């Protein structure tokens, strides 16, 4: 029995998402995924085995994933009946219903339609007894256009906990730059609510490499963390002269703190391999316990550049004989880059993405 997977991604990164998913499925489960369709902001892959070879956390370039149960061409008038007919054939109860679309300008125009359509669908399914509080499966309707819907299902371990796989955050009014949203999203995605409470505590220390104007430093300060802000550029706003900030106009690749710190964060514009090696050196040497950093990827061969950078990290940590956690995601607030979380020690040993 073949299964088709829907992977949602940032527009322009579809082939990277496809390449990565096929590689991960083959290396981890011995499953060959066959390309079915590459659209704008999504990819369809087919497997001959009824297994889900990965979850959304295992893939850097895919925001979320689900299993397609129907691909329906819709008419102009009645879009509800064909969907109800398909769902009615499945002996499934759903915890919730999400309407989704590609993260494109045309896709975003679907949001108005979704606001009107979703209550109608929920009412029909609730009346039919297909919605239940004890269910875990989520029904996801992905509209590449108004005339087509991919009906799919997802479990919590497969798909991201946000529609479209997008965690939307509000820009803080007093943050020095919009880059602050990158670190805020990274903490939420990699640590979760409980992890942030446990690992981001007042009184901790951190180093921010490439800190100016202070977007990432601001996220640390709001949690009461002392920051060495390393950058030749000026800090701005509340980060300029803050009592918890020590601004050092030094080379980020040469700086080391006088004592080990709890956190290392870095958003420097540099080759991904060089940044990866620097981050791994810090943790292997014991200069930092955890790190969040961005890898700026080249326009061509992005998946290859990412794989090379991660292999450099793994080689360094292996040479040091250290257990570690390694996770990678292209976050919503990232652009031509991915964000990496690297930590030691890892209670369960190595965890690649």
Curated annotation (Swiss-Prot):
Reactions this protein catalyses: cytidine(2498) in 23S rRNA + S-adenosyl-L-methionine = 2'-O-methylcytidine(2498) in 23S rRNA + S-adenosyl-L-homocysteine + H(+)
Coiled-coil annotated spans: none
SUPFAM superfamilies found in the cross-reference section: S-adenosyl-L-methionine-dependent methyltransferases
GO terms classed as biological process: methylation; rRNA processing
Primary location recorded for the protein, binned into one broad class: cytoplasm
Active-site residues from the entry: 296
Assigned keywords, A-Z: Cytoplasm, Methyltransferase, rRNA processing, S-adenosyl-L-methionine, Transferase
Pfam families, alphabetized: FtsJ, RLMM_N
GO MF annotations in UniProt: S-adenosylmethionine-dependent methyltransferase activity
EC number: 2.1.1.186
Compartmental location: Cytoplasm
UniProt binding sites for S-adenosyl-L-methionine: 179, 212-215, 231, 251, 267
GO cellular component annotations of the record: cytoplasm
Enzyme class: transferase
PANTHER family registered for this protein in UniProt: RIBOSOMAL RNA LARGE SUBUNIT METHYLTRANSFERASE M, RIBOSOMAL RNA METHYLTRANSFERASE FTSJ DOMAIN-CONTAINING PROTEIN
Function description: Catalyzes the 2'-O-methylation at nucleotide C2498 in 23S rRNA.
Family the UniProt entry places it in: Belongs to the class I-like SAM-binding methyltransferase superfamily. RNA methyltransferase RlmE family. RlmM subfamily.
UniProt subunit comment: Monomer.
Protein name: Ribosomal RNA large subunit methyltransferase M
């Amino acid at each position: 029995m073949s299964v088709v997977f829907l992977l949602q991604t940032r527009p322009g990164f579809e082939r990277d998402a496809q390449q990565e998913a096929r590689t991960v499925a083959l290396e981890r489960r011995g499953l060959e995924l066959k390309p079915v369709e590459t659209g704008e902001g999504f990819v369809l892959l087919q497997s001959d085995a009824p297994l889900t070879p990965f979850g959304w956390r295992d893939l850097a370039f895919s925001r979320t994933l689900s299993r397609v149960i129907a691909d329906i061409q819709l008419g102009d008038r009645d879009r509800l009946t064909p969907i109800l007919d398909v769902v009615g054939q499945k002996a499934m109860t759903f915890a919730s219903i999400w309407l989704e679309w590609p993260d494109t300008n045309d896709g975003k125009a679907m949001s108005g339609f979704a606001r009107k359509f979703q209550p109608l669908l929920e009412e029909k399914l609730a009346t039919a007894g297909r919605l239940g509080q004890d269910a875990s499966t989520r029904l996801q309707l992905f509209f590449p256009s108004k005339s087509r819907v991919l009906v799919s299902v997802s479990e919590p371990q497969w798909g991201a906990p946000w529609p479209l796989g997008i965690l939307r955050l509000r820009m803080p009014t007093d943050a020095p730059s919009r880059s602050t949203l990158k670190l805020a999203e990274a903490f939420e995605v990699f640590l979760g609510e409980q992890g942030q409470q446990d690992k981001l505590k007042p009184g901790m220390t951190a180093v921010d490499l490439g800190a100016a104007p202070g977007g990432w430093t601001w996220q640390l300060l709001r949690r009461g963390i002392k920051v060495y802000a390393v950058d030749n550029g000026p800090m701005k706003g509340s980060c300029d002269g803050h009592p918890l900030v020590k601004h050092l106009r030094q080379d980020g690749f040469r700086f080391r703190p006088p004592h080990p710190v709890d956190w290392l964060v870095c958003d420097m514009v540099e080759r991904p391999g060089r940044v990866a090696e620097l981050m791994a050196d810090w943790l292997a040497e014991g200069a930092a316990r955890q790190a969040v950093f961005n890898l700026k990827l080249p326009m061509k061969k992005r998946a290859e550049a990412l794989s090379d950078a991660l292999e450099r990290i793994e080689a360094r940590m292996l040479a040091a004989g250290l257990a570690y956690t390694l996770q990678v995601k292209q976050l919503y607030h990232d652009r031509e880059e991915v964000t990496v979380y690297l930590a030691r020690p890892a209670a369960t040993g190595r965890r690649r993405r």
